[in-house]
Amino acid sequence: MHIKCACLLFFLNAYQYLQTATRLKTGSPECSFDHVFQYAKLIQKMKKSKKKLRVGVVGTGYLGKFHAEKYARMDDVDLVGIADINKSQAEKIAKKYSVKAYTSHKDILDKIDAVSIVVPTPAHYKVSRDFLEHDVDVLIEKPMTTTLEEADKLIQFAEARGLIIQVGHLERFNPAVIALRDYVKKPLFIESHRLSTYKERATDVSVVLDLMIHDIDIISNFVRSKVESIHAAGIGVISKHVDIANARLEFENGCVANVTASRISTRDERKIRLFQRDAYISVDFANHGITIVKKSNKDKSSIIPGMDINKLCFNKGDALDDELKSFVKAVKKRVSPEVTGQVGRSALKIALSIMQQIQNRNRSYFV
């Protein structure tokens, strides 16, 4: 009798988890008993939502060390271990937070519930897949992968097992970007400039996948329309990949975006301007400020006649801390993350199309 009750409870719990999983934007698995056993294994994660989440960090480069720092400070997180093929670097960061260091990510597959994957982009797919196969939820630094095929495989695998994929589009958590939601209404023209001085650490991919993809994600989030056509140009000046690029994106709803990114600039700049009916909005990401210029019928002097100018400033905040806390919340509550795998894939698709345009142009130009 006890065995029958236990079996019934097992299946009911599994069924309940399936219903919860269907609410995740990362996927909607079919509610069939063929899936029960693999989902039942994840029930424990839901039951442990009030306990500390066991987290790991793979990759201790420039960004990885900050991921470790943020997790170590969270009261509801247990930073279990840090992995990096560079043994001395892994040990250095691990010692700082009194956790174990590993030279292979495979050594922590069975020790954690969630992981930040902060390795070079070409390794994103393989490392992420290994963790997903062990029922570990993943936060993958942007770009999600190097190809759409890899992104699709990760998304499909996560969907089938009710797992969470969050992509690290950090600017989503910038206070200025969050504030934009209250002011941006159907923009018709957008222009962005993301310029950076040269840094060797980010040259394993093109500037399109390294920097421009931030603005691609932001613009796509506000335009909410499919890209109809792309015209792009770019060239590698210092590295073997494209170091400076410009793209004109035309959306189905009529909006046009002119996007520029460079990692060989003499200065750092991260700005975007959005033009819409009766107003335009200028955002300085680096200084966390927004300038809103709106049409006005008020009879008063202004720098621009007939226009009101309002400037908003925001505290710098900690976008990475907010991003990681959002990931932890999504994992513990089993809810959709702020930037799902599908969202990361959408930005990647546009970025790869831009890269293809650049390659085609350069192939015909440098003959």
Region spans (language model):
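C-terminal glycine/acidic-rich active-site capping loop/insertion
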Residues: 170, 276-342, 346, 363-367
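Beta-loop-alpha module in the N-terminal Rossmann-like domain of NAD(P)-dependent dehydrogenases
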Residues: 67, 97-155
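Mid-domain beta-loop-alpha active-site segment that forms a flexible
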Residues: 168-175, 198-227, 343-344
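Cysteine-centered motifs
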Residues: 5-7, 31
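Contiguous beta-strand/loop segments that form the cofactor/metal-binding neighborhood of enzyme cores
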Residues: 17, 216-289, 317, 321-334
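A contiguous active-site-proximal alpha/beta segment in oxidoreductase catalytic domains
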Residues: 145-202
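C-terminal helix-rich "cap/oligomerization" subdomain common to oxidoreductases
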Residues: 21-23, 28-49, 114-117, 326-367
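N-terminal Rossmann-like dinucleotide-binding module
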Residues: 31, 36-97, 219, 328, ...
